[in-house]
Amino acid sequence: MGRAFEYRRAAKEKRWDKMSKVFPKLAKAITLAAKEGGSEPDTNAKLRTAILNAKAQNMPKDNIDAAIKRASSKEGNLSEITYEGKANFGVLIIMECMTDNPTRTIANLKSYFNKTQGASIVPNGSLEFMFNRKSVFECLKSEVENLKLSLEDLEFALIDYGLEELEEVGDKIIIRGDYNSFKLLNEGFESLRLPIIKAGLQRIATTPIELNDEQMELTEKLLDRIEDDDDVVALYTNIE
């Protein structure tokens, strides 16, 4: 993966450490989940997951409660929209947004692409086939060990809930499954009483590409602008 990958990862982690930017995105996910499925986490799996992800980023309880309450107000009039774009060097970009003003959102995104030579927004659906949608869960290896489970035991226990792949990364375990298995996998973790530290739906490129340091640095300028937009809650590329 090389230095370009390390640069990309370090830069992304640095950006997401800015809580002032993270919290609005997390709050929107909570508000939308509460709007769609009700304000009770016990009966709304999507809301439970949104709250779990917020807590993992140390979002205060007052902020979480306020985001849930917004679901029943005019501020809760959010919609989910996905936009797609291309950049230089064969880079493909998918942007998942939550917004109360789609006109503002697309205008902002177009301005970011227009400021980058060779980059452009493309019609929705143009890049969809270049990415696989996956359910992705993270848990701590120590929590698995506390349940007296080996990784093989965990894999066997979650296969019936839609597990496709299990990966050990440092002190964490990454579980991946089909996009449509998100709810089922969540139930699998609950049945095991295994705490989840992060969960979500991700898009994984079918044919990743590698960029050299110079290409990565140029591309990063566009990705920075996109990720700094409060309406953008998730950004996916085909960069390795």
Swiss-Prot record:
It comes from the Bacteria. Belongs to the TACO1 family. It comes from Helicobacter pylori (strain J99 / ATCC 700824) (Campylobacter pylori J99). HAMAP family: Transcrip_reg_TACO1. This is Probable transcriptional regulatory protein jhp_0149. One of its GO terms (cellular component) is cytosol. Disulfide bonds: none annotated. Gene3D superfamilies: 1.10.10.200, 3.30.70.980.
